[in-house]
């Protein structure tokens, strides 16, 4: 990276740090720890619309301000695997009428492991002729990529040419964790910064003991590494594919103290308070757990008031936020009972407005 690029990167990072610090200042937060990103080739996911122009066909994106389309032949934010695939894929699709007909979008999902899933989205139904062409495409791409899979999507249709997931291997504090990342399910896009987030969370919980509750646990991104520090971990997640991936990940990482339940945060709150029983909690007696710590990684809207009141029951709260504005709103209530002991900024998306943040809250007194 040139000195000019480094300067540009640092300037946008400094602006984010100032913005987060201002939002956290009413809560007497300590100085924010900052975890930078590679300025390019950091994204493990990318999606593009496809534009047809005569015999040509290319990826496009839309300018966020003008809404004008522009051609994208390479995409510096995406990892090198995705960039390599973009050119090679279109070179194969352009002359192939079966693969290009009514193709309107291409999604890429990759991993530090080098695995790749390419999803081709169509405005037409896909038949056996398409599947044969897609298998041939996969064989051709396999000469360049060690493990590549193709998915065809159309209305109410999904054809998978071998797998709809990548197997990721994340290095975290000297351990390697295996994760199945499923196409069209949420995963952290910036794998290297994600590792830093997990390591920060591990540092937060190092002195703690007892059991951990994680809400919005996804495929176990935090639950699994943190299981090494707690007696037991219970994770809640509403998305069925993520729950299934989490079960696979628990087995792959040989963890015996983690349970994932398919409940919304609001439902789990009701179960904890004994207001409702759920068949999905069969075999799990919540009263037997000694939950000392809760980790939440909510969507952009933050936590609802009932969930906030529920997590106030725990001595330690690790809050991962993809929206610092709603984090600050939630802290107004949480700060009645807890102090901000640590704060961190993770630059998941360089050169964008987006901030990923983390705070550790500990009970007052």
Swiss-Prot record:
It holds the Pfam family tRNA_U5-meth_tr. Its EC number is 2.1.1.-, 2.1.1.35. InterPro entries: MeTrfase_TrmA_AS, SAM-dependent_MTases_sf, TrmA_MeTrfase, U5_MeTrfase_fam. Keywords: Methyltransferase, S-adenosyl-L-methionine, Transferase, tRNA processing. S-adenosyl-L-methionine binds at residues 188, 216, 221, 237, 297. It is an enzyme of class 2 (transferase). It catalyses: uridine(54) in tRNA + S-adenosyl-L-methionine = 5-methyluridine(54) in tRNA + S-adenosyl-L-homocysteine + H(+); uridine(341) in tmRNA + S-adenosyl-L-methionine = 5-methyluridine(341) in tmRNA + S-adenosyl-L-homocysteine + H(+). One of its GO terms (molecular function) is rRNA binding. GO terms for cellular component: cytosol. Gene3D superfamilies: 2.40.50.1070, Vaccinia Virus protein VP39 (3.40.50.150). It comes from the Bacteria. One of its GO terms (biological process) is tRNA methylation. The active site is at 322 (nucleophile), 356 (proton acceptor). HAMAP family: RNA_methyltr_TrmA (MF_01011). Dual-specificity methyltransferase that catalyzes the formation of 5-methyluridine at position 54 (m5U54) in all tRNAs, and that of position 341 (m5U341) in tmRNA (transfer-mRNA). Belongs to the class I-like SAM-binding methyltransferase superfamily. RNA M5U methyltransferase family. TrmA subfamily. This is tRNA/tmRNA (uracil-C(5))-methyltransferase. It comes from Alteromonas mediterranea (strain DSM 17117 / CIP 110805 / LMG 28347 / Deep ecotype).
């Amino acid at each position: 990276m040139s000195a000019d690029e480094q300067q540009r990167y640092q300037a946008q990072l400094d602006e984010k740090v100032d913005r987060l610090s201002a939002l956290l200042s009413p809560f007497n937060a300590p100085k924010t720890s900052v975890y930078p990103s590679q300025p390019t080739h950091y994204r493990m996911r990318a999606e593009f619309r496809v534009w047809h122009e005569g015999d040509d066909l290319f990826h496009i994106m839309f300018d966020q301000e003008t809404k004008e389309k522009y051609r994208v032949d390479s995409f510096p934010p995406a990892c090198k695997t995705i960039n390599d695939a973009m050119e090679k894929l279109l070179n194969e699709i352009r002359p192939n009428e079966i693969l290009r007909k009514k193709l309107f979008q291409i999604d890429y999902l990759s991993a530090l492991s080098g695995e790749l899933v390419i999803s081709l989205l169509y405005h037409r139904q896909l038949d056996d002729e398409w599947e044969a062409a897609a298998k041939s495409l996969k064989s051709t791409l396999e000469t360049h990529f060690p493990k590549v899979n193709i998915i065809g999507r159309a209305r109410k249709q999904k054809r998978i040419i071998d797998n709809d997931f990548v197997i990721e291997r994340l290095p975290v504090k000297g351990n390697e964790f295996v994760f199945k990342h499923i196409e069209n399910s949420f995963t952290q896009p910036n794998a290297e910064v994600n590792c830093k987030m997990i390591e920060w969370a591990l540092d937060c919980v190092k002195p703690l003991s007892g059991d951990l509750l994680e809400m919005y646990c996804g495929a176990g991104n935090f639950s699994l590494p943190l299981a090494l520090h707690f007696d037991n971990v219970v994770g809640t997640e509403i998305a069925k594919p993520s729950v299934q991936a989490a079960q696979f990940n628990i087995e792959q990482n040989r963890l015996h103290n983690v349970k994932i339940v398919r409940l919304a945060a609001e439902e789990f709150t009701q179960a904890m308070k004994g207001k409702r029983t759920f068949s999905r909690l069969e075999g799990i007696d919540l009263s037997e757990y000694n939950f000392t710590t809760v980790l939440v990684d909510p969507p952009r809207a933050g936590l609802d008031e009932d969930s906030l009141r529920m997590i106030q029951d725990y001595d330690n709260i690790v809050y991962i936020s993809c929206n610092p504005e709603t984090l600050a709103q939630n802290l107004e209530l949480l700060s009645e009972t807890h102090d901000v002991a640590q704060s961190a900024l993770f630059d998941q998306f360089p050169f964008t407005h987006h901030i990923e943040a983390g705070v550790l809250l500990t009970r007052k007194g």
